[in-house]
A protein has these predicted regions:
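Extracellular/periplasmic helix-loop-helix junctions in multi-pass membrane proteins
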Residues: 257-261, 333, 371-372, 397-417
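Long, contiguous internal "core" modules enriched in hydrophobic/ aromatic residues
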Residues: 35-40, 44-64, 155-354, 451, ...
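Central hydrophobic cores of alpha-helical transmembrane segments
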Residues: 377-387
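Extramembrane terminal tails and long inter-domain/linker segments of multi-pass membrane proteins
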Residues: 1-46, 147-162, 192-228, 301, ...
Length: 464
């Protein structure tokens, strides 16, 4: 028997799925990804999807215009429920963007190669989600044209923002998050923009991509500065994954409202944000790989890893639900106990049971490898989880406000047509921006995939 032959009773070692499909070269990777932008026709599916999302964006514009004309009374908010769909949607959209930052920055610093195929469109998802989230604080105030009052700028009247207000904290957190994410995304695009510039046949495309590439020539000096800047921004973006949704959670945690005033909110909100963010990445990645034949670049390894991250963060979210109830009863605070009972037996209990089904029970299927490797089931589960995370925000915001300290101040919340139209409009805006992004810029990082080709070929030779 050869010394290199394994013993007969040795357990079979399961090989991981590749991060990149076999047989690819530098040229084939570039051709496949760049062709989606430069040469592939739009197709009836893209045109139909864009038309639908554009229609929803028009619904959003009409909803905001009617809001400005008539005021926030067109929504279902009232006294005491002054925070309705606007804040629910704001928190939900901000959370969705977190997976893009985690994939781009934290996994980059941890040298996780499987991020390479998904980081570009995950970063774009972050920017589009932040854009959708930014709409709601503005229109929630009822006077969006007065939004500049929230910025600290020198004025002759000497008016300064109230820095003890969580609304001001949100302005700084979200604007910082959006700025760093935009810089991180754009710097990563520079080598690919130069590739598109050099391969474009259309003069207009050459001018646009040439201007955006900012003179990139691929010299050693360019690559050195690019890698230094990318590493620096990854280091800056990493704490933002924790800080942004922590600040958003302070909107609730610093208040004395029962159900909000709890210390579990910061880690609970961060875990929930990553949870919903990875669900949205799966929601985008699965149709994208199917529509453009990118199965060799977004492989089962990527889907399996994202499902595992969803399972892990879902367990943290479930722990947060448990701690909420435990602390309510352990503290003996009768207001917190009553609110916990209202979530189980009150007028909005069906929303609470729905979120438990979506966020805790359904994701337990991800323990099974067959489920994680079933693409259609993963897609459905990602939609279910995103729905559950929206319901979680609704339960936190609305139920806590409907049952306050004084029974005479209790109320009911009934969303109106304009609440739903604004939500659907932002979903349309998000999807429309994704449709434009996929056809205007490379959805997968060409330069990083080229590096992966070299690394995969070296590892193949080492195994042989």
């Amino acid at each position: 028997m050869s010394v290199t032959q394994p013993p007969l009773n040795a357990p079979e070692i399961r090989r991981l799925d590749p991060v990149l499909g076999p047989g690819h070269t530098y040229a084939s990777v570039t051709d496949k990804i760049a062709s989606v932008v430069l040469t592939r026709p739009l197709g009836i599916g893209w045109l139909a999807g864009f038309a639908l999302t554009f229609t929803l964006v028009m619904v959003l514009f009409i909803s905001i215009a009617w809001l400005i004309i008539k005021g926030v009374g067109i929504w279902g908010i009232n006294i005491p429920i002054g925070w309705g769909f606007a804040i629910v949607n704001f928190v939900w959209w901000i959370g969705i963007g977190h997976a893009g930052t985690l994939i781009s920055a934290i996994l980059f610093l941890l040298n996780q190669k499987w991020r390479t195929s998904i980081n570009r469109f995950a970063e774009a998802m972050t920017l589009f989600a932040v854009a959708c989230a930014g709409i709601f604080p503005l229109i929630h105030t009822g006077r969006p044209w007065m939004a500049y009052y929230m910025f600290p700028y020198p004025s002759t009247m000497g008016i300064w923002p109230q820095f003890r207000s969580p609304l001001i904290w949100d302005v700084f957190a979200v604007s910082t998050y959006g700025t760093v994410s935009l810089l991180f995304w754009f710097i990563g695009l520079l080598p690919d923009l130069a590739t598109l510039r050099d391969r474009a046949k259309n003069r207009f495309q050459q001018l646009i991509y040439g201007a955006l590439a900012m003179g990139w020539r691929g010299s050693a000096q360019h690559w050195h500065r690019y890698q230094s800047a990318y590493l620096l921004l990854a280091g800056l973006a990493t704490p933002l994954v924790l800080s942004v949704h922590t600040v958003v959670s302070f909107d609730f945690a610093v208040a004395i409202v029962p159900g909000w005033h709890t210390t579990i909110f910061p880690p609970y909100f961060v875990a929930g944000a990553i949870y919903s963010g990875f669900a949205m990445v799966l929601t985008i990645a699965i149709p994208l790989r199917k529509a453009y034949g990118l199965e060799d670049f977004i492989t089962m390894r990527h889907l399996d890893n994202m499902a595992k991250v969803m399972l892990a963060t879902g367990l943290i979210v479930a722990y947060g639900y448990f701690v909420e109830f435990f602390m309510a009863f352990y503290s003996g605070n009768k207001f917190d106990v009553f609110l916990a009972q209202q979530r189980l037996h009150g007028p909005y209990s069906h929303y609470y049971y729905a979120l438990i089904l979506c966020n805790i029970l359904t994701p337990q299927l991800l323990w099974f490898e067959k489920v994680r490797r079933n693409v259609a089931l993963l897609f459905v589960m990602s939609l279910v989880i995103n729905t559950g995370m929206w319901l979680e925000r609704f339960v936190i915001v609305v139920i806590s406000l409907t049952r306050d300290f004084v029974p005479s101040a209790w109320g009911r919340y009934q969303p109106t047509f304009w609440d739903f139209s604004t939500l659907l409009g932002t979903l349309g805006l998000f999807a429309m921006l994704l449709f434009l992004f996929v056809r205007g810029l490379p959805a997968i990082a060409i330069s990083e995939m080229r590096e992966l080709v070299g690394q995969e070929s070296h590892s193949d030779r080492d195994r042989k």
